Swiss-Prot record:
It comes from the Eukaryota. It is found in: Cytoplasm. May negatively regulate the SNF1 kinase. Coiled coil: none annotated. Residues 1-79, 190-226, 367-419, 468-522, 549-819 are annotated as: Disordered. GO terms for cellular component: cytoplasm. The gene is SIP5. Residues 28-37, 210-224, 374-402, 479-513, 575-604, 613-644, 697-714 have a biased composition (Low complexity). InterPro entries: Sip5/DA2 (IPR039301). CDD domains: SIP5-like. Belongs to the SIP5 family. Residues 1-11, 65-79, 549-573, 743-772, 798-812 have a biased composition (Basic and acidic residues). Keywords: Cytoplasm. This is Protein SIP5.
Length: 819
């Protein structure tokens, strides 16, 4: 009894210490207190539970909040501990363990994660089925001395060739006169007994001098390096052995052979590295005793071999169905697959290596021969026993031995002396199965989620339909037509009986519906699932068709682009050919450009200055226009325009005549063939004038001489009867002349040099249109500034020889005022 927290918190059933004063209490007092204390404590705890107060909460404080360690942090701590343990084990193994001069741990050629099974690799190296981890040399020279080779093999600085070698580079053999050494050698060669046998005589016979002396293989002291190494190796590979059935089998016991640093009178490092070879993958120099691939017999060091592994599990999407007609069932089912590693030299699948060990034994070995150790050839022959003297024939040059024993054919991956990458990493099947199970769980969860969502949506739709049906029925009952409200009120006592009768009559139908509701729901679910599958199949077909249509549309678009490009190239080629042949619109009858001479000569206008030595160009222009008019024949006046193309530039030009009659005929023909869209310009001219436009286009003179009303009319229409009317090129005279020349070149295909005068071509003029069919021809508005020639052909002034009218006088005054 009491309020002490220690009394209440102490367990009554806990054993009392001998120093506890309660242990010396009387028996009856202890029995009485033991019977009363639990009852009182239970009552107090019950009361505390009723009031929400826990025992001891008043006197004790809450412990501070401690942050729990996450899974990632635990994994990181675990990996760090394993890394530190590996570093310690590496240092110990490099100092104490070796196999024929090689090591059982990697030497840092690759700094990545070592995910291979270290216990399996260690066992294979001790069995001499896999080459040990030799120390690789960055450089090697055949001129090195023995001490330099020993220093390079041990990772020490390379001394000078003529320097005195240090003591650590001089191997010290064990003297044969030493009794401890001889006893150690004898004891190390004895096969240790695994346990007590049934024969006691054998125990007595073995308990002599040999068993009483210390032996590294049978000493039970805790300082034995073999037990410690096996314990550390087992601790490092505990996680891998859980998922690996091959490591569950107890490995044979390891023993250490007697220390002998010499092989045939040479240091062991010199014997190994004097005929070194280079690994084709890491480019380091190693002893010639390397692994060789089973397929192409290429050398590969152990550090490079243990880095090669299978690819991660993946789907067989990239595998050709046509090439591999007979695929494994995993690929046909669409499951994850894991392909074996390929040879880095010939890409043969299922990479495996073979190893021919050196003809001596040093370091670690197994006490009892394993089933695979009898097939090792040279390593297990009589010349390479544990303590035999090696003959010179067996210690021949390893290079010559390798060349004489070089394999000429590949070995099977299941051969007993072949070590594959799957043997080094035996957990690949477990990883593949775990990945497949993970994918299956995800797929099942996704399918269940989609199915549940689909069924829930359908159930909600059915519930809404059922509620709507009932509501419509109730609404129909509520809105049933009656004779009147009074009649309904008078018949209200009889409604319950009618409702009961209706319910009794409807009860059999509802019972049948309820009994068949379960089957209906299951059938509806199956039908919905089938509908969903059909919908997904139809959607897949639609997407495939849409993709095919898109591909066809793109192909057609590319074809159209290609056709347009070819058409443009053909047009360019045709134009280039036309220019090179001299048949273009800018060439004359002689093939040379005559723009300055004939293309800009417009005879028959009687305007412009006379240029010297231009009679030939005038004659050529007149002959070209005459031949074009003769070729047109008696066709419609629009034929010239239509032949010129769709630009509206085909205009027939009149010819200048020597007589007045021929000039009148030419003017009438030109006026009849003038297009309707041309600007009317009037030009008074003397009948007998022989003149032409300037050979070089002068736009300013033409623009200054054209006075047209804003309404499109012709200024000075009163003078059209007295003077001739002929078309004059306006702002686009050069382009019109070019089009005329093009038409002329096409028309005179029979004779390009034929000359026809105006009086011969005037007979073939096309008939003029009536006034109602076409508008009046354009007229030329002549200003006082327009140049002209007199009757004699000499240029006396720059004014036309006509009388100015009143309108011209007004215009002249306005121009003078504005100037």
């Amino acid at each position: 009894m009491g309020n002490s927290h220690t009394k209440e918190a102490r367990d009554p059933n806990a054993p009392l210490s001998p120093h506890d004063p309660r242990s010396h209490a009387s028996g009856h007092h202890a029995s009485g207190s033991s019977s009363s204390r639990p009852r009182n404590r239970a009552s107090r705890s019950d009361l505390g539970g009723l009031f929400g107060i826990s025992a001891g909460s008043s006197s004790s404080t809450q412990p501070p909040y401690e942050r729990r360690e996450t899974k990632q942090e635990r994994e990181a701590r675990k990996l760090e501990r394993e890394r530190q343990a590996r570093l310690i084990e590496r240092e110990r193994s490099l100092k104490e363990e070796h196999v024929d001069g090689g090591y059982l741990v990697t030497l840092g050629t690759y700094v990545g994660t070592e995910d291979f099974n270290k216990a399996v690799v260690r066992q294979l190296q001790i069995e001499r089925r896999l080459a040990p981890f030799w120390r690789g040399l960055n450089d090697f020279s055949e001129t090195w001395t023995e001490y330099q080779i020993v220093a390079a093999a041990r990772g020490l600085p390379l001394p000078a060739a003529d320097a005195i070698p240090p003591d650590e580079l001089i191997p010290r053999p064990i003297s044969a006169t030493s009794p401890a050494a001889s006893t150690q050698n004898i004891d190390s060669l004895m096969v240790p007994m695994g346990g007590r046998t049934q024969s006691t005589a054998s125990d007595r016979s073995g308990s002599g001098l040999g068993s009483s002396l210390p032996s590294p293989t049978s000493a039970p002291s805790s300082k034995s390096p073999f037990k410690r190494s096996k314990g550390i190796a087992a601790a490092l590979n505990l996680s891998s052995s859980r998922n690996n059935s091959t490591t569950d089998i107890a490995a044979p016991r390891e023993i250490k052979l007697p220390h002998d640093p010499f092989v045939n009178g040479q240091p062991m490092e010199v014997f190994l590295y004097k005929d070194g070879s280079e690994c084709p993958i890491c480019f380091l120099y190693y002893p010639p005793y390397l692994n060789h691939t089973r397929c192409c017999d290429q050398p590969i060091c152990s550090e490079c071999f243990v880095q090669i592994k299978r690819a991660d599990p993946h789907y067989p999407d990239g595998h050709g169905d046509a090439q591999n007609s007979e695929r494994p069932p995993e690929e046909q089912a669409g499951l994850l697959i894991s392909e074996p590693a390929c040879c880095p030299y010939c890409q043969q699948p299922e990479l495996g290596v073979t190893y021919d060990p050196p003809p001596f034994r040093r370091g670690l070995t197994y006490s009892s021969p394993t089933p695979h150790m009898g097939t090792m050839g040279t390593a297990m022959s009589s010349s390479s026993s544990l303590n035999s003297s090696l003959s010179p024939s067996s210690l021949a040059s390893p290079t010559s031995m390798g060349h004489s024993r070089r394999r000429t054919q590949s070995l099977s991956a299941n051969a007993p002396n072949v070590v594959t990458t799957d043997r080094v990493r035996p957990d690949w099947a477990t990883k593949l199965a775990a990945q497949r199970a993970h994918i299956a769980r995800r797929a099942a969860a996704a399918t269940a989620l989609h199915t549940a969502a689909f069924l829930m949506s359908n159930n909600e739709q059915q519930r809404s339909l059922r509620i709507g049906r009932f509501s419509r029925r109730n609404t129909a009952e509520r809105t049933a037509p009656g004779p009147s409200t009074n009649a309904a009120a008078s018949n209200s006592p009889a409604r319950p009986e009618a409702a009961a009768a209706e319910s009794e009559s409807a009860s059999p139908g509802t019972g049948e519906a309820r009994s068949s509701s379960g089957r209906g729901i299951m059938g509806a679910r199956r039908s919905r699932m089938e509908d969903l599958e059909e919908m997904m199949f139809a959607e897949a077909i639609r997407l495939s068709l849409a993709a095919e249509e898109e591909r066809k549309r793109k192909a057609e678009k590319e074809e159209r682009k290609e056709a347009k490009r070819k058409e443009k190239e053909d047009k360019k080629a045709a134009k280039a050919a036309a220019k090179s042949s001299g048949s273009g619109p800018y060439t004359g009858s002689s093939g040379n450009s005559s723009i300055a001479g004939s293309a800009l000569s417009l005879p028959g206008l009687g305007l412009g200055r006379r240029r010297g030595n231009s009679a030939a160009s005038n004659l050529r222009m007149e002959a070209s226009v005459a031949s074009a008019v003769a070729a047109s024949g008696s066709g419609s006046p629009e034929s010239a325009t239509a032949a010129g193309g769709d630009k509206g530039k085909g205009v027939e030009r009149p010819m200048a005549a020597n007589s007045g009659d021929s000039s009148e005929h030419a003017e009438a023909g030109a006026s009849s063939s003038m297009p309707a869209g041309s600007q009317p310009i009037s030009s008074p001219q003397r009948p007998g004038g022989h003149s032409h436009l300037r050979q070089i286009s002068n736009v300013s003179s033409v623009s200054d001489s054209s006075f047209v009303d804003a309404s499109g009319g012709v200024a000075d229409e009163g003078r059209t009867a007295a003077t001739g009317v002929e078309p004059t090129p306006n702002m686009t005279s050069l382009s019109e002349v070019v089009d005329v020349l093009d038409e002329v070149d096409h028309a005179k295909s029979h004779d390009a040099t034929e000359v026809q005068h105006l009086e011969n071509a005037s007979d073939n003029k096309p008939p003029s249109k009536d006034a109602g069919e076409a508008p009046s021809p354009p007229e030329l508005v002549v200003t006082p500034g327009t140049p002209a020639l007199n009757n004699e052909g000499f240029e006396t002034n720059k004014q036309l020889d006509i009388k100015p009218t009143a309108q011209h006088d007004d215009q002249q005054q306005q121009r003078q005022q504005s100037a």
